[in-house]
Amino acid sequence: MKIYVDNVTGEIVESPDPVAGLYIKSRNGDLVKATLPDGAIGFQIGETAQVQTGGVLQATPHAVKGLTGTASRVSRETFAVFMEPEYHSSMALPEGRTLEDTQCAGAEEWLPSSVRTLRSRWKPKMNFGEFSEATFAAFH
């Protein structure tokens, strides 16, 4: 769910910039604006699910393009819910899955150079807290 709010009046408005919003990287490397119909909810698979499914589910690279120019007086408001394991929970691979299944080198092909790969941050036997700390350190 997203809404746009005029920061001067506090009123909910339509998006003043058709280019602004959530973009995802498709499996063939295209940057695609993610659009949902009104009242719909989108689910995005993250790297934790990628590890815990042994690569059956793949994380979706994404970014938000902000409003520019006179539209910058409008804010984009979203409500995100992050589902994650307990801090000390194991991030072990499921039985029968391999490191190669989970950290598919092909999936890294379309990442921007500024994005640290899953392969560089997650190692076998890490727990969720260790993985989170490695991820925060890589990006901040």
List each language-model region with its residue ranges.
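C-terminal flanking tails of non-heme Fe-dependent oxygenases
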Residues: M1-H140
